[in-house]
Amino acid sequence: MRYTKSEEAMKVAETLMPGGVNSPVRAFKSVDTPAIFMDHGKGSKIYDIDGNEYIDYVLSWGPLILGHRDPQVISHLHEAIDKGTSFGASTLLENKLAQLVIDRVPSIEKVRMVSSGTEATLDTLRLARGYTGRNKIVKFEGCYHGHSDSLLIKAGSGVATLGLPDSPGVPEGIAKNTITVPYNDLDALKIAFEKFGDDIAGVIVEPVAGNMGVIPPIEGFLQGLRDITTEYGALLIFDEVMTGFRVGYHCAQGYFGVTPDLTCLGKVIGGGLPVGAFGGKKEIMDQIAPLGNIYQAGTLSGNPLAMTSGYETLSQLAPETYEYFNMLGDILEDGLKRVFAKHNVPITVNRAGSMIGYFLNEGPVTNFEQANKSDLKLFAEMYREMAKEGVFLPPSQFEGTFLSTAHTKEDIEKTIQAFDTALSRIVK
């Protein structure tokens, strides 16, 4: 494949934007390949400005659960935009999407719409602290909850130590109110609560970690979080920005049967437009302004375009949708294991609904430390060879791949064949 136009576009972009991009992963640095500039998408396919076609497993990093340019979503967006883009006042569309979210998400009795997943997690932590009167938050290593200061935190030097800034610009005073423990490790969480329990406002977790590859919870982990937070009077917060409506019809909490106090949403609920949301029990949500004293606001929160795209996306999802995802996922997982075994290359495949992650190691992979043992050099080679075969994968080992309703068995079979061809070139 040729990337002449993308390379030229990137040279211009680098003079205009830091690194030439508006989000770091789009620079493709970890796979040592030129950034690709996209032109359009249709169904399960995406097309770059050089005219190359790919089967798309990035799907705008998760939101496009119906694939690109779904006819129903696009048609209703045209109708909405003809009425205006934003009004600074409420619309009936907000009621429609809010009701649908409340009906499907077990933990949500009331919901507040925002404009991004980062806003959702940031506002949820403020709400948790305001509601409990406590300061500290527990997060898990490898889980990403957006780029707010209190969540860009890495672990300290030992189990359940106070956090350290993970980015320049994050004050130590903020970092010290974030406790980081290993994912899937209830013993570490218990130690954290034994040391700081009286001042822990909440525990925030991706119920399926999707930002260190895809790592599902081990059996009993989520229920353990529920039990421990309840015991200490802290709030359990599920960050379902990625897993929401991807893992199951009732989100990850419905799939695993564990109900948090608060839930953060994003990605799928906007159908490709900027959106986020957070919700939970009425008694907690009613502490937010204008009913309560905990402040939250947003100029474009609940804007009619995002509400339209979100509603028309979610309204097309049904329990049968997830049966289809499981069928495609089974074929892809079996094919990956078969092809990698054929070439004597170790692989660990993790799945949850329409989220799939593969690690180039023996496994198992249940936490960030194990994820880091994946062969990153081989992953980069694999990415480059798969792009040549017309398959667009996330350009990072630590991002998940996604399926959409637009993907077909033929797409999956072509992808498996592409892996076989790529490995044939890589493994001598």
Swiss-Prot record:
Modified residues annotated as N6-(pyridoxal phosphate)lysine in this record: K267
InterPro entries: 4pyrrol_synth_GluAld_NH2Trfase, Aminotrans_3, Aminotrans_3_PPA_site, PyrdxlP-dep_Trfase, PyrdxlP-dep_Trfase_major, PyrdxlP-dep_Trfase_small
Keywords (A to Z) from UniProt: Cytoplasm, Isomerase, Porphyrin biosynthesis, Pyridoxal phosphate
Gene Ontology cellular-component terms listed: cytoplasm
Annotated pathway: Porphyrin-containing compound metabolism; protoporphyrin-IX biosynthesis; 5-aminolevulinate from L-glutamyl-tRNA(Glu): step 2/2
CDD domains listed in its UniProt record: OAT_like
Catalytic reaction annotation: (S)-4-amino-5-oxopentanoate = 5-aminolevulinate
Cofactor(s), by name: pyridoxal 5'-phosphate
Enzyme class: isomerase
Subcellular location: Cytoplasm
Main subcellular location of this protein, as a coarse class: cytoplasm
GO molecular-function terms, A-Z: glutamate-1-semialdehyde 2,1-aminomutase activity; pyridoxal phosphate binding; transaminase activity
Assembly mode: Homodimer.
Family from the record: Belongs to the class-III pyridoxal-phosphate-dependent aminotransferase family. HemL subfamily.
UniProt-recorded name of the protein: Glutamate-1-semialdehyde 2,1-aminomutase 1
